[in-house]
A protein has these predicted regions:
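Membrane-interface interhelical connector segments
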Residues: 34-53
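Extended, low-polarity transmembrane helix blocks
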Residues: 1-34, 55-63, 67-70, 74-140
Length: 140
């Protein structure tokens, strides 16, 4: 059967699509809204799940959702930025959204999306970048 046939470059291409898709959607949905011109509106009500202050918590989310998502999309320091974003999303899912998954109640309307991000990011932490990344051009 054709489905059983493995291609040599398919895995690399699939992981590149996963990396680019994860980074781009994280940036477009969560990073773009955290750009510096919008910081004032976030500071007033940003959660403080690990008790380091709302400003510090927002800065961690900004680095994860804005900076790391762009680096992930380009394939720069893939494992490290995926790990940073994974940790940030895991903390948000656990401590802010209380592991909500099915969307029953306030703040639980996108738990399944958080799980999908976590699975994709963990895959990228384990595998790293692919041949289709800046890391591979730089020889890392």
């Amino acid at each position: 059967m054709a489905f059983q046939k493995q291609s040599s470059g398919g895995g690399e291409a699939a992981l590149a699509i996963l990396r680019i898709g994860t980074g781009a959607t994280l940036f477009l949905r969560h990073g773009w809204e955290k750009q510096p011109m919008h910081w004032a509106q976030f500071m007033a009500h940003f959660p403080n799940p690990i008790h380091i202050g709302a400003h510090a918590s927002f800065f961690i989310a900004f680095v994860s959702d804005f900076v790391c998502s762009l680096l992930l999309t380009l394939g720069i320091w893939t494992r490290w930025v995926a790990l940073f974003s994974f940790c940030n999303i895991l903390v948000a899912w656990a401590l802010v959204h209380r592991f909500a998954f099915f969307g029953r109640g306030p703040g639980s309307d996108h738990g399944e999306v958080m799980v999908l991000y976590l699975v994709a990011l963990l895959t990228l932490v384990i595998h790293g970048s692919t041949a289709f990344s800046v890391d591979s051009v730089r020889g890392r």
